[in-house]
Design a protein with these regions (language model features):
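Hydrophobic anchor at the start of a short beta-strand
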Residues: 13, 34-36, 272, 394-397
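Glycine-rich FAD pyrophosphate-binding loop
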Residues: 30-54
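Conserved flavin/dinucleotide-binding core of flavoenzymes
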Residues: 3-4, 107-109, 319-322, 336-464
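Active-site/ligand-binding neighborhood in enzyme catalytic cores
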Residues: 114, 131-251, 255-258
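Conserved Rossmann-like nucleotide-cofactor binding loop
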Residues: 21, 44, 279
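Dinucleotide-binding Rossmann-like beta1-alpha1 core, especially the glycine-rich loop
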Residues: 55-143
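N-terminal Rossmann-like FAD-binding beta1-loop-alpha1 element of flavoenzymes
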Residues: 11-38
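Mid-domain catalytic core of redox enzymes
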Residues: 32, 247-356, 363-374, 386-387, ...
């Protein structure tokens, strides 16, 4: 919906940003019986979640899955009546790591790529004998006594050795977040590993004690219409007129209530939830609290690009038996990773065809996205062809640029967020949510959006 003017009544809550966190917050607030409006600067809701569908192809331009271990997304699907449409990844669910030009499977019995059983370590062809010996010695490595944040590279190198940094932490742990392994915070992104060391003195020993076993359904699920189906269903579940698109907020002010100026008109609300990137939050808050604005704008962001390519099956010689691969920086390629989409999910390509996605840029290679569209497409296409034995040109290509859409939880991020929360207490009724602060990934964004909605609802109800 677009609007040239907004109702001049005072709403309970105004939400700025219709990404998944903002939509989840709106859904929760509507369920509580509060009046809500969501202002979205672009022409559609969903943020980085978007799915393109044509001629039997289904292409997620952003995230393509929901992590089952974090139940917020699956729970929301259940509430929306689409849980029965959730589909697991296809078998086999093998993921690969590129080393010296060859793809090596991550062995069964691994957690986040780390072999936690002796069998997994022995079976792995990814590591040298020296690397395996160093990783096996993790159980003998003393725990850290200093209680302060450190980078993923520092933590993994200290406990598992350099090969684990280069071939697991860099492409997998940092790659998930499009970041630089030397800068990203282990405590902010993988607190479970930090807690394992603290409690047991050994990550491997702690994970073995938990008896981590893969779910028969796999770690991830999606929907037949891609992750965009979740956004479509969630948006439709809100009352007509709740989402106002092409409504870029230009000013936020507070007196007895909050006044929000946007390109769609003026909105007044008792409470405001900012569900936009941290740097946008900062720009909106600068006239109100410049210190808070500085804190928000200090959250670094990376830009990424996704290149999708469609082929006939007979053009690809690689068996594509698995979900895809990641590329360590030591390999010297532009690609960060590749997904074998049609092998990972059912119904993503017409029969006899293959859909692939390649990823470029991120905190590891920030200047890559200075290249033009055709150069990015050609780079991804050529590297995929070399790795997977592809002949001929793709039937089509798509490029999706995500400029400053990947927040980087660098060392010290948790302290910054705590400081932001303290400053927000000076602005009663104003709350922040989304991936820039406490939530990486769809389930966490949904959970944080709904938790923030509950806080906004409590504020409004206490003043009713």
């Amino acid at each position: 919906m677009n609007a040239s003017a907004l109702d001049d009544s005072v709403l309970d809550v105004a939400i700025v940003g219709a990404g998944i966190a903002g939509l989840a917050a709106a859904f929760d607030l509507r369920a509580r019986g509060l009046t809500v409006c969501v202002l979205e600067a672009t022409a559609r809701p969903g943020g980085v979640i978007a799915t393109e569908r044509f001629d039997g192809w289904t292409i997620d331009s952003g995230p393509d899955s929901l992590l089952v271990q974090k139940p917020a997304a699956v729970t929301l699907c259940r509430e929306l009546g689409i849980a029965d449409r959730l589909v697991p990844t296809l078998m086999p669910r093998t993921a690969y790591v590129l080393r010296e030009g060859r793809l090596h499977a991550i062995a069964e019995g691994s957690f986040l790529g780390f072999p936690i059983t002796l069998g997994a370590l022995v079976r792995s062809r990814l590591f040298s004998l020296a690397g395996k010996a160093r990783m096996a010695g993790e159980v003998l490595t003393p725990r850290r006594t200093v209680d302060e944040d450190e980078s993923i590279a520092s933590f993994v190198g200290r406990r598992f050795g350099r090969e684990a940094v280069d071939y697991l932490a860099d492409p997998l742990l940092a790659g998930i977040h499009a970041g630089d392994v030397d800068r990203l915070s282990i405590r902010a992104l993988f607190p479970r590993l930090v807690d394992a060391e603290r409690r047991s003195g050994s990550v491997i020993r702690a994970l073995r004690a938990l008896h981590v076993r893969p779910s028969p359904q796999g770690a991830f699920v999606s929907l037949p219409g891609g992750t965009g189906e979740l956004v479509d269903t969630l948006s439709a579940a809100l009352a007509p007129g709740t989402i106002v698109t092409n409504a870029r907020v230009t000013r936020l002010a507070r007196s007895d209530v909050y006044a929000i100026d946007s390109t769609a008109g003026l909105l007044r609300a008792r409470s405001v939830v900012l569900a936009v990137p941290a740097y946008v939050t900062g720009s909106l808050l600068r006239p109100v609290d410049s210190t808070l604005a500085d804190l928000c704008e200090a959250v670094p962001y990376a830009s990424t690009a996704t290149v999708a390519c469609g082929y006939r099956h007979d053009q690809v010689s690689h068996p594509l038996s698995g979900t895809g691969f990641v590329v360590p920086r030591t390999e010297g390629l532009a690609l960060l990773a590749g997904t074998w989409v049609s092998s990972k999910w059912p119904g993503r390509a017409p029969n006899g065809h293959v859909l692939l996605r390649g990823y470029l840029g991120g905190g590891r290679d920030p200047r890559r996205l200075e290249a033009g569209d055709q150069e990015l497409i050609s780079t991804a296409q050529q590297e995929l062809a070399e790795l997977l034995g592809i002949s001929g040109s793709p039937l089509f290509t798509r490029l999706y640029r995500w400029t400053r859409q990947s927040p980087q939880y660098e060392v010290g991020h948790l302290q910054r967020v705590a400081h932001i929360e303290r400053r927000l207490t000076n602005l009663p009724g104003l709350f922040v949510t989304g991936s820039g602060f406490r939530a990486i990934g769809i389930p966490d964004c949904i959970s944080d959006g709904r938790t923030t909605a509950a806080r906004a609802a409590d504020y409004v109800m206490q003043r009713s």
